[in-house]
């Protein structure tokens, strides 16, 4: 099991060189290689991988996005979105989006550090993932236009070997395309793949070092 004792260690570890692309690629869809050069017109975005304790065991907050026909429609993801002109930093973006989408105040979140950014071609987004810690179980106020529901996942269960699969996925926004992709199969209804899985993969590698 992964306990809250890991938080201070993670804070230190995120200041060291990160596993980066090598760790992310463990869960990258086989349809493409990640570009080595990020386009100049990439849109800056940020997400928050929020950890919180349940009986001293670290859980990870995920959300199920609404089915709205957008590139990430219906997917399991982290709270997050595009950088706004009112955001001084990308950390501010991640915290603002988390509050807007699930109702958790920025003042209650301890931002531990940043994971490795990654480019998502389908949405032209350069995503900056941040790791946060909430010292108590969250209370939610969901944005019904963006989030169907939340999923609380104990890290040690998500990282179990049997949770990793390779499958064929037809994205809701692109019904004519089938991707071969590695994924975390949380249960029969919840498949975590794409950028979210790649971010989780780096966190998993960090915690297993």
PLM region spans:
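Short, glycine/charged-enriched secondary-structure capping and boundary segments
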Residues: 76-77, 125-127, 145, 166
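NUDIX/MutT-family hydrolases
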Residues: 142-182, 186
């Amino acid at each position: 099991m992964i306990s809250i004792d890991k938080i201070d260690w993670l804070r230190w570890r995120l200041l060291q060189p990160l596993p980066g692309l090598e760790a992310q690629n463990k869960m990258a869809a086989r349809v493409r290689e990640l570009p080595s050069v990020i386009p100049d017109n990439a849109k800056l975005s940020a997400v928050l991988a929020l950890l919180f304790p349940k009986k001293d065991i670290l859980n990870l907050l995920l959300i199920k996005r609404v089915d709205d026909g957008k590139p990430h429609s219906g997917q399991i993801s982290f709270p997050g979105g595009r950088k706004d002109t009112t955001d001084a930093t990308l950390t501010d973006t991640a915290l603002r989006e988390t509050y807007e989408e699930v109702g958790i105040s920025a003042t209650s979140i301890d931002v531990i550090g940043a994971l490795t950014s990654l480019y998502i071609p389908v949405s032209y987004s350069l995503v900056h993932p941040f790791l946060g810690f909430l010292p108590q179980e969250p209370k939610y106020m969901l944005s019904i236009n963006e989030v169907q529901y939340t999923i609380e996942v104990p890290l040690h269960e998500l990282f179990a070997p049997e949770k990793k699969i390779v499958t064929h996925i037809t994205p809701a926004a692109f019904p004519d395309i089938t991707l071969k992709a590695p994924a975390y199969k949380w249960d029969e209804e919840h498949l975590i793949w794409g950028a979210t899985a790649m971010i989780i993969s780096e966190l998993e590698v960090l915690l297993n070092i």
